[in-house]
């Protein structure tokens, strides 16, 4: 898969406002400041397609991007930012839950975690929620350039334990040096491939 075209479509407070239905969707989820915007920019080879912010919790809306005129990348609000009041957290939680329950086009979720830290309670909750909903996902361990190659495997162990995945199922990612980009593009190609119709009996 090659990303030849990428454009920002809309921001929305509720998924019900989205008019771009009909195309498959890939959602990007993760806590605030885990590098979602940077991943989207690197994936699309565009420096400022998704606005990156030094202020965690900036993405308070669901942002939709159209890639290759053939699928949508849905950037979900970052969760788990301490400075946000309880009401706002509840609103975010409902916004995301509504999206997962209402989107018929969702094919896969990219769950971003920082490779340098153990997954938070919010990461575990998201993981459990996706499993209960039966939504396929892949864990993306971001900021891999911040640690040595040798340390990566060691850092993956607590992530695997917390999120019940195997090391080979995780994509180590760096928006700085492009680590994991080819792997992620291959995953998207597989996920977006039209489902083969079962042969008639």
Q: What does each model-found stretch correspond to?
A:
Residues 1-83, 200:
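Conserved G1/Walker A P-loop phosphate-binding module
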Residues 3-15, 146-201:
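Canonical P-loop GTPase G-domain recognition
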Residues 22, 48, 61, 72, ...:
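Helical mechanochemical/support elements of P-loop NTPase systems and associated helical scaffolds
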Residues 45-49, 102, 132, 190, ...:
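Conserved amphipathic alpha-helical interaction elements at protein-protein interfaces in regulatory
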Residues 65, 142, 184:
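Residue-level signal for inorganic ion chemistry
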Residues 94-168:
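Conserved C-terminal guanine-recognition region of P-loop GTPase G domains, centered on the G4
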């Amino acid at each position: 898969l090659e990303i030849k075209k990428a454009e920002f479509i809309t921001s929305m407070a509720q998924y019900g406002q989205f008019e771009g239905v009909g195309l498959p969707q890939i959602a990007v989820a993760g806590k605030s400041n885990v590098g979602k915007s940077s991943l989207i920019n690197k994936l699309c080879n565009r420096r400022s397609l998704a606005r990156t912010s030094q202020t965690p919790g900036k993405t308070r809306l669901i942002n939709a991007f159209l890639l290759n005129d053939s699928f949508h990348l849905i950037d979900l609000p970052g969760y788990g930012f301490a400075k946000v009041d309880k009401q706002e957290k509840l609103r975010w939680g409902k916004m995301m839950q509504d999206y997962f329950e209402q989107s018929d086009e969702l094919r896969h979720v990219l769950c971003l975690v920082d490779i340098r830290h153990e997954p938070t309670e919010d990461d575990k909750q998201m993981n459990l929620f996706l499993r209960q909903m039966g939504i396929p996902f892949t864990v993306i361990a971001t900021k891999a350039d911040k640690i040595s190659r040798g340390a990566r495997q060691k850092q993956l162990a607590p992530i695997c334990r917390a999120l019940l995945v195997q090391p080979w199922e995780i994509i180590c990612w760096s928006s700085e040096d492009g680590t994991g980009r080819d792997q992620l593009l291959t995953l998207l190609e597989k996920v977006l491939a039209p489902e083969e119709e079962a042969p008639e009996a």
